[in-house]
Amino acid sequence: MRPLQIVPSRLISQLYCGLKPPASTRNQICLKMARPSSSMADFRKCFAKAKHIVIISGAGVSAESGVPTFRGAGGYWRKWQAQDLATPLAFAHNPSRVWEFYHYRREVMGSKEPNAGHRAIAECETRLGKQGRRVVVITQNIDELHRKAGTKNLLEIHGSLFKTRCTSCGIVAENYKSPICPALSGKGAPEPGTQDASIPVEKLPRCEEAGCGGLLRPHVVWFGENLDPAILEEVDKELGRCDLCLVVGTSSVVYPAAMFAPQVAARGVPVAEFNTETTPATNRFRFHFQGPCGTTLPEALARHENETVS
């Protein structure tokens, strides 16, 4: 069997955020190795020794909080799937419809709270930090539930629902207004028969920087867009330094994030996957724990009997 060939980290920033891997890496990442272990006791031994832990999280973590994933057969908003709306072309063609979609998603988050998985991660970061150990979360989620749970060392590689970027001046700003603009009040209903609001572009969210007034867009990475090279540089540093990696609630099919954990595993670092099902990358990892993250993570990340807090 050929050894796994890892794409050089400098190439990661050149990859697109798509649903399929680049052709040159598709077969490399999914090579199957020995069946992973499901021994929590063995994982806990690795956890007890780890000084620099990276946790890569995906939609499965937030799904347990009731956050819509917009994936699979039921993943529709009106008659569209996320990949129909979360693109630069869709925004250029119909910014009103795209803003209705994101307004709906922002409003939904008002009633959602971090679950036991989010809380276990945040508590672990705080606890281990007092011991001089580092925990970093690299998330593909844009819902800010990790932040809400108390996670501080957080890299949101796909952006945030609660940040905007001006299409004219480029300013990125936090925005928690509800609604984000008056014209979106009461809009965004997800039912299939709902008609588009067709809001005039001048009434959509606008930049408040002096002298600008440009059209705002959600500060999220859309299909076909590159990830922020600065964030990916930070990701690369964390992946290169970690001595334990957890892959939590991610399908391992969205690139380039799907390459992160295999990159770590290839240098011999223990990687543990926590998911409700196996993924294309499962057999690349040392551990696999099947079940809801809100059930498996609290046990996995709980205080070890030999832990001491300075």
From Swiss-Prot:
One of the GO BP terms on file: regulation of ketone biosynthetic process
Residues involved in Zn(2+) binding: C166, C169, C207, C212
Gene symbol of the encoding locus: SIRT5
Domain notes: In contrast to class I sirtuins, class III sirtuins have only weak deacetylase activity. Difference in substrate specificity is probably due to a larger hydrophobic pocket with 2 residues (Tyr-102 and Arg-105) that bind to malonylated and succinylated substrates and define the specificity.
Assembly and binders: Monomer. Homodimer. Interacts with CPS1. Interacts with PCCA.
Catalytic reactions on record: N(6)-malonyl-L-lysyl-[protein] + NAD(+) + H2O = 2''-O-malonyl-ADP-D-ribose + nicotinamide + L-lysyl-[protein]; N(6)-succinyl-L-lysyl-[protein] + NAD(+) + H2O = 2''-O-succinyl-ADP-D-ribose + nicotinamide + L-lysyl-[protein]; N(6)-glutaryl-L-lysyl-[protein] + NAD(+) + H2O = 2''-O-glutaryl-ADP-D-ribose + nicotinamide + L-lysyl-[protein]
Domain of life from the UniProt record: Eukaryota
Compartments it resides in: Mitochondrion; Cytoplasm, Cytosol; Nucleus
Required co-factors: Zn(2+)
Record family assignment: Belongs to the sirtuin family. Class III subfamily.
GO annotation, cellular component aspect: cytosol; mitochondrial matrix; mitochondrion; nucleus
All copies of domain Deacetylase sirtuin-type, residue ranges: 37-307
GO molecular function, one term: protein-malonyllysine demalonylase activity
Keyword annotations from UniProtKB, A to Z: Cytoplasm, Metal-binding, Mitochondrion, NAD, Nucleus, Transferase, Transit peptide, Zinc
Residues noted as binding substrate in the record, renumbered to the chain: Y102, R105
Binding positions for NAD(+) per the UniProt entry: 58-77, 140-143, 249-251, 275-277, 293
Residue span of the annotated presequence: 1-36
HAMAP family given in the database record: Sirtuin_ClassIII
Identification of the protein by name: NAD-dependent protein deacylase sirtuin-5, mitochondrial
Cofactor notes: Binds 1 zinc ion per subunit.
Protein's job: NAD-dependent lysine demalonylase, desuccinylase and deglutarylase that specifically removes malonyl, succinyl and glutaryl groups on target proteins. Activates CPS1 and contributes to the regulation of blood ammonia levels during prolonged fasting: acts by mediating desuccinylation and deglutarylation of CPS1, thereby increasing CPS1 activity in response to elevated NAD levels during fasting. Activates SOD1 by mediating its desuccinylation, leading to reduced reactive oxygen species. Activates SHMT2 by mediating its desuccinylation.
Enzyme Commission numbers on file: 2.3.1.-
